[in-house]
From Swiss-Prot:
Coiled coil: none annotated. GO terms for biological process: defense response to fungus; killing of cells of another organism. Pfam families: Thaumatin. This is Thaumatin-like pathogenesis-related protein 1. Residues 1-21 form the signal peptide. It comes from Avena sativa (Oat). The keyword Signal applies. Keywords: Antimicrobial, Fungicide, Pathogenesis-related protein, Plant defense, Signal. Disulfide bonds: none annotated. Associated with resistance against stem rust fungi. InterPro entries: Osmotin/thaumatin-like_sf (IPR037176), Thaumatin (IPR001938), Thaumatin_CS (IPR017949). Belongs to the thaumatin family. SUPFAM superfamilies: Osmotin, thaumatin-like protein (SSF49870).
Length: 169
């Protein structure tokens, strides 16, 4: 058993050594305030029109999601949003509906990313990585997005890449 644990630890250490954190640059080009949210990294914050902010995502993060919430009102971290609400919390621990989702996994030599409208569409979004394809989603029928769980809209990106998410591009 000790040998199995040592091998597993060594494999994880090698995987982690090849991966590094990714920076997600989030830009709000909408004519109104958007409240970006993210799980498991990012929580939630206010992003006024024409502003940008960065989120640092550690290597090894999988099943990550970032989305924009609209029509929000918060007081001491509690409130509500017209779209993308996550149980009335400013800092989200679950995703809200309806929302256009930027989904990602930050791996070792390769990352994966996509846009999903499975849970609904609320904001036009561009999502790109520094070494991959720019995904564009302007409406609920956008061809670059997942529309049902069996879609094949996931894209690969070189590991150690950074990302750009733009609301209302």
């Amino acid at each position: 058993m000790a040998t199995s644990s040592a091998v597993l630890f060594l494999l994880l250490a090698v995987f982690a050594a090849g991966a590094s954190a990714a920076t997600f640059r989030i830009t709000n080009n909408c004519g109104f305030t958007v409240w970006p949210a993210g799980i498991p990294v990012g929580g939630g914050f206010q992003l006024n029109s024409k502003q940008s902010s960065n989120i640092n995502v550690p290597a090894g993060t999988s099943a990550g999601r970032i989305w924009g919430r609209t029509g929000c009102s918060f007081n001491n971290g509690r409130g509500s949003c017209a779209t993308g609400d996550c149980a009335g919390a400013l800092s989200c621990t679950l995703s809200g509906q309806p929302a256009t989702l930027a989904e990602y996994t930050i791996g070792g030599s390769q990352d994966f990313y996509d846009i999903s409208v499975i849970d609904g569409f609320n904001l036009a979004m561009d999502f790109s990585c520094s070494t991959g394809v720019a995904l564009k989603c302007r409406d609920a029928n956008c061809p670059d997005a997942y529309h049902h769980p069996n879609d094949v809209a996931t894209h690969a990106c070189n590991g150690n890449s950074n990302y750009q998410i733009t609301f209302c591009p």
